[in-house]
Amino acid sequence: MAVGKNKRLSKGKKGLKKKVVDPFQRKEWYDIKAPTTFENRNVGKTLINKSTGLKNAVDGLKGRVVEVSLADLQGSEDHSFKKIKLRVDEVQGKNLLTNFHGFDFTSDKVRSLVRKWQSLVEANVTVKTADDYVLRIFCIAFTRRHQNQIKKTTYAQSSQLSAIRKKMVEIMQREVSNVTLAQLTSKLIPEVIGREIEKAAEGIYPLQNVHIRKVKVLKQAKFDLGALLALHGESVTEENGKKVGSEFQDVVLETV
Protein backbone atom coordinates (compact mmCIF):
# COMPACT_ATOMS: atom_id res chain seq x y z
CA MET A 1 0.00 0.00 0.00
CA ALA A 2 1.34 3.36 -0.95
CA VAL A 3 1.90 5.73 1.92
CA GLY A 4 0.72 9.22 1.22
CA LYS A 5 -1.98 11.79 1.61
CA ASN A 6 -5.54 10.50 1.29
CA LYS A 7 -7.21 13.10 -0.88
CA ARG A 8 -10.70 11.95 0.03
CA LEU A 9 -10.17 12.34 3.77
CA SER A 10 -8.40 15.70 3.49
CA LYS A 11 -11.21 17.40 1.61
CA GLY A 12 -12.81 20.18 3.58
CA LYS A 13 -16.45 21.08 3.78
CA LYS A 14 -17.97 22.54 0.68
CA GLY A 15 -19.22 26.10 0.74
CA LEU A 16 -16.55 27.50 3.08
CA LYS A 17 -15.13 30.79 1.77
CA LYS A 18 -11.60 32.00 2.20
CA LYS A 19 -11.10 34.93 4.52
CA VAL A 20 -10.83 38.06 2.41
CA VAL A 21 -7.99 40.32 3.59
CA ASP A 22 -8.14 43.95 2.53
CA PRO A 23 -4.69 44.76 1.06
CA PHE A 24 -5.10 48.44 1.96
CA GLN A 25 -5.01 47.61 5.69
CA ARG A 26 -1.24 47.17 5.40
CA LYS A 27 -0.77 50.45 3.52
CA GLU A 28 -0.84 54.14 4.40
CA TRP A 29 -1.36 57.34 2.41
CA TYR A 30 1.09 60.23 2.11
CA ASP A 31 0.48 63.72 0.66
CA ILE A 32 2.83 64.89 -2.11
CA LYS A 33 3.80 68.57 -1.80
CA ALA A 34 5.23 70.63 -4.67
CA PRO A 35 7.70 73.51 -4.07
CA THR A 36 6.38 77.05 -3.56
CA THR A 37 7.50 77.86 -7.14
CA PHE A 38 4.12 76.48 -8.26
CA GLU A 39 0.75 77.98 -7.34
CA ASN A 40 -0.89 74.68 -6.34
CA ARG A 41 1.30 72.75 -3.89
CA ASN A 42 -1.05 69.78 -3.37
CA VAL A 43 0.05 67.36 -6.07
CA GLY A 44 -1.83 64.29 -4.85
CA LYS A 45 -1.41 61.21 -2.68
CA THR A 46 0.70 58.06 -2.85
CA LEU A 47 0.60 54.65 -1.16
CA ILE A 48 3.30 52.73 0.70
CA ASN A 49 3.36 49.62 2.88
CA LYS A 50 3.45 50.43 6.59
CA SER A 51 6.73 50.15 8.47
CA THR A 52 7.21 46.58 9.70
CA GLY A 53 10.33 45.18 11.34
CA LEU A 54 13.45 46.36 9.55
CA LYS A 55 11.48 47.74 6.60
CA ASN A 56 10.92 51.47 7.01
CA ALA A 57 8.25 53.15 4.88
CA VAL A 58 10.35 56.33 4.62
CA ASP A 59 13.12 54.48 2.77
CA GLY A 60 10.63 53.35 0.12
CA LEU A 61 9.26 56.86 -0.35
CA LYS A 62 12.51 58.79 -0.78
CA GLY A 63 13.56 58.94 -4.41
CA ARG A 64 10.09 58.40 -5.85
CA VAL A 65 9.45 60.40 -9.03
CA VAL A 66 5.97 61.61 -9.95
CA GLU A 67 4.91 63.22 -13.24
CA VAL A 68 2.33 66.01 -13.08
CA SER A 69 0.75 68.30 -15.65
CA LEU A 70 1.88 71.91 -15.25
CA ALA A 71 -1.74 72.95 -15.87
CA ASP A 72 -2.71 71.30 -12.55
CA LEU A 73 0.16 72.95 -10.69
CA GLN A 74 -0.51 76.43 -12.13
CA GLY A 75 -4.31 76.21 -12.39
CA SER A 76 -4.23 77.24 -16.07
CA GLU A 77 -5.06 75.20 -19.17
CA ASP A 78 -2.48 77.21 -21.14
CA HIS A 79 0.18 74.86 -19.73
CA SER A 80 -1.69 71.62 -20.47
CA PHE A 81 1.00 70.37 -22.88
CA LYS A 82 3.82 70.73 -20.32
CA LYS A 83 4.79 67.96 -17.91
CA ILE A 84 6.79 68.37 -14.70
CA LYS A 85 8.65 65.61 -12.86
CA LEU A 86 8.99 65.95 -9.09
CA ARG A 87 11.30 63.83 -6.91
CA VAL A 88 10.60 63.05 -3.23
CA ASP A 89 13.64 64.20 -1.21
CA GLU A 90 12.29 64.40 2.36
CA VAL A 91 9.45 62.97 4.46
CA GLN A 92 7.90 65.10 7.22
CA GLY A 93 5.06 63.36 9.01
CA LYS A 94 2.54 62.50 6.30
CA ASN A 95 3.92 65.09 3.84
CA LEU A 96 6.41 64.31 1.07
CA LEU A 97 8.60 67.30 0.17
CA THR A 98 9.58 67.22 -3.51
CA ASN A 99 12.02 69.01 -5.78
CA PHE A 100 12.17 69.61 -9.55
CA HIS A 101 13.40 66.53 -11.43
CA GLY A 102 12.54 67.16 -15.09
CA PHE A 103 10.44 68.95 -17.68
CA ASP A 104 8.97 67.76 -20.97
CA PHE A 105 6.38 68.49 -23.66
CA THR A 106 3.61 66.04 -24.52
CA SER A 107 4.29 64.13 -27.75
CA ASP A 108 1.11 65.43 -29.42
CA LYS A 109 2.22 69.04 -28.86
CA VAL A 110 5.63 68.42 -30.46
CA ARG A 111 3.99 66.73 -33.46
CA SER A 112 1.53 69.61 -33.89
CA LEU A 113 4.41 72.10 -34.19
CA VAL A 114 6.05 70.31 -37.14
CA ARG A 115 4.63 71.60 -40.44
CA LYS A 116 5.69 71.76 -44.08
CA TRP A 117 7.32 74.74 -45.84
CA GLN A 118 9.51 75.56 -42.80
CA SER A 119 12.86 74.51 -41.31
CA LEU A 120 13.21 72.79 -37.94
CA VAL A 121 16.06 73.90 -35.66
CA GLU A 122 17.07 71.82 -32.63
CA ALA A 123 19.89 72.17 -30.11
CA ASN A 124 20.84 70.69 -26.74
CA VAL A 125 23.47 71.53 -24.16
CA THR A 126 24.70 70.12 -20.83
CA VAL A 127 24.96 72.83 -18.15
CA LYS A 128 25.67 72.98 -14.42
CA THR A 129 23.43 75.30 -12.39
CA ALA A 130 24.61 77.65 -9.65
CA ASP A 131 23.61 75.06 -7.00
CA ASP A 132 25.56 72.20 -8.71
CA TYR A 133 22.77 70.39 -10.58
CA VAL A 134 23.91 69.01 -13.96
CA LEU A 135 21.13 69.41 -16.55
CA ARG A 136 20.68 68.70 -20.24
CA ILE A 137 18.49 71.32 -21.94
CA PHE A 138 16.75 70.67 -25.28
CA CYS A 139 15.48 73.54 -27.44
CA ILE A 140 13.25 73.48 -30.53
CA ALA A 141 12.39 76.26 -33.01
CA PHE A 142 10.89 76.75 -36.47
CA THR A 143 11.52 79.32 -39.17
CA ARG A 144 8.80 81.74 -40.25
CA ARG A 145 8.21 84.20 -43.10
CA HIS A 146 9.98 87.51 -43.32
CA GLN A 147 7.87 90.64 -43.10
CA ASN A 148 6.04 91.29 -46.43
CA GLN A 149 7.28 87.95 -47.81
CA ILE A 150 5.24 86.55 -50.71
CA LYS A 151 7.10 83.25 -51.14
CA LYS A 152 5.33 80.34 -49.45
CA THR A 153 8.39 78.43 -48.20
CA THR A 154 10.60 79.55 -45.31
CA TYR A 155 13.58 77.22 -45.66
CA ALA A 156 16.79 78.52 -44.06
CA GLN A 157 20.27 77.81 -45.40
CA SER A 158 22.55 75.38 -43.54
CA SER A 159 24.89 78.24 -42.52
CA GLN A 160 21.92 80.13 -41.04
CA LEU A 161 20.77 77.03 -39.16
CA SER A 162 24.28 76.57 -37.71
CA ALA A 163 24.34 80.22 -36.60
CA ILE A 164 20.92 79.85 -34.94
CA ARG A 165 22.05 76.69 -33.10
CA LYS A 166 25.14 78.52 -31.87
CA LYS A 167 22.93 81.32 -30.51
CA MET A 168 20.66 78.75 -28.85
CA VAL A 169 23.58 77.07 -27.05
CA GLU A 170 25.05 80.40 -25.91
CA ILE A 171 21.76 81.68 -24.48
CA MET A 172 20.89 78.38 -22.77
CA GLN A 173 24.33 78.22 -21.12
CA ARG A 174 24.10 81.84 -19.99
CA GLU A 175 20.54 81.63 -18.67
CA VAL A 176 21.00 78.32 -16.80
CA SER A 177 24.55 78.48 -15.38
CA ASN A 178 23.89 81.68 -13.40
CA VAL A 179 20.70 80.56 -11.63
CA THR A 180 19.64 77.89 -9.14
CA LEU A 181 17.31 75.01 -10.00
CA ALA A 182 14.35 76.81 -8.39
CA GLN A 183 15.04 80.00 -10.37
CA LEU A 184 15.29 77.97 -13.58
CA THR A 185 11.87 76.45 -12.87
CA SER A 186 10.47 79.98 -12.61
CA LYS A 187 11.95 80.75 -16.05
CA LEU A 188 10.53 77.60 -17.66
CA ILE A 189 6.91 78.38 -16.76
CA PRO A 190 6.63 81.72 -18.70
CA GLU A 191 9.16 80.52 -21.36
CA VAL A 192 11.65 83.35 -20.79
CA ILE A 193 14.55 81.52 -22.48
CA GLY A 194 12.53 80.81 -25.65
CA ARG A 195 11.71 84.50 -26.07
CA GLU A 196 15.39 85.43 -25.61
CA ILE A 197 16.43 83.00 -28.37
CA GLU A 198 13.71 84.27 -30.71
CA LYS A 199 14.85 87.87 -30.19
CA ALA A 200 18.56 87.03 -30.66
CA ALA A 201 17.97 85.05 -33.88
CA GLU A 202 15.87 87.77 -35.53
CA GLY A 203 18.93 89.11 -37.39
CA ILE A 204 19.82 85.65 -38.77
CA TYR A 205 16.38 84.29 -39.71
CA PRO A 206 12.93 84.96 -38.17
CA LEU A 207 11.79 82.18 -35.81
CA GLN A 208 8.48 81.05 -34.34
CA ASN A 209 7.38 78.47 -31.77
CA VAL A 210 10.71 78.64 -29.90
CA HIS A 211 10.46 76.42 -26.81
CA ILE A 212 12.60 74.69 -24.22
CA ARG A 213 10.90 71.37 -24.87
CA LYS A 214 12.81 69.17 -22.41
CA VAL A 215 14.98 69.43 -19.29
CA LYS A 216 16.74 66.32 -18.01
CA VAL A 217 18.48 66.10 -14.60
CA LEU A 218 21.73 64.19 -15.17
CA LYS A 219 23.27 64.64 -11.72
CA GLN A 220 21.75 65.66 -8.41
CA ALA A 221 23.46 68.18 -6.15
CA LYS A 222 24.46 67.26 -2.59
CA PHE A 223 21.30 67.04 -0.47
CA ASP A 224 20.70 70.17 1.62
CA LEU A 225 17.75 69.93 4.02
CA GLY A 226 17.79 73.67 4.76
CA ALA A 227 17.55 74.56 1.07
CA LEU A 228 14.71 72.07 0.54
CA LEU A 229 12.73 73.43 3.51
CA ALA A 230 13.28 76.99 2.26
CA LEU A 231 11.96 75.88 -1.14
CA HIS A 232 8.79 74.69 0.61
CA GLY A 233 8.44 77.85 2.71
CA GLU A 234 9.56 76.23 5.95
CA SER A 235 12.45 76.84 8.33
CA VAL A 236 14.92 74.33 9.72
CA THR A 237 15.64 76.45 12.81
CA GLU A 238 12.12 76.35 14.27
CA GLU A 239 12.01 75.34 17.94
CA ASN A 240 9.13 73.56 19.61
CA GLY A 241 10.26 74.30 23.16
CA LYS A 242 9.71 77.50 25.11
CA LYS A 243 12.63 79.45 26.49
CA VAL A 244 12.69 79.91 30.27
CA GLY A 245 12.99 83.51 31.42
CA SER A 246 16.11 84.68 33.25
CA GLU A 247 14.00 86.15 36.10
CA PHE A 248 13.20 82.66 37.44
CA GLN A 249 14.34 82.20 41.06
CA ASP A 250 14.47 79.14 43.29
CA VAL A 251 11.95 79.09 46.13
CA VAL A 252 13.53 78.42 49.55
CA LEU A 253 11.25 76.69 52.05
CA GLU A 254 11.44 77.92 55.66
CA THR A 255 10.50 74.58 57.16
CA VAL A 256 11.06 71.11 55.89
Swiss-Prot record:
Major localization class: cytoplasm
Protein name: Small ribosomal subunit protein eS1
Keywords annotated in UniProt: Acetylation, Cytoplasm, Ribonucleoprotein, Ribosomal protein
Family according to the record: Belongs to the eukaryotic ribosomal protein eS1 family.
MF GO annotations: structural constituent of ribosome
InterPro entries: Ribosomal_eS1, Ribosomal_eS1_CS, Ribosomal_eS1_euk
The keyword Ribonucleoprotein is annotated on this UniProt entry: yes
Organism name: Komagataella phaffii (strain GS115 / ATCC 20864)
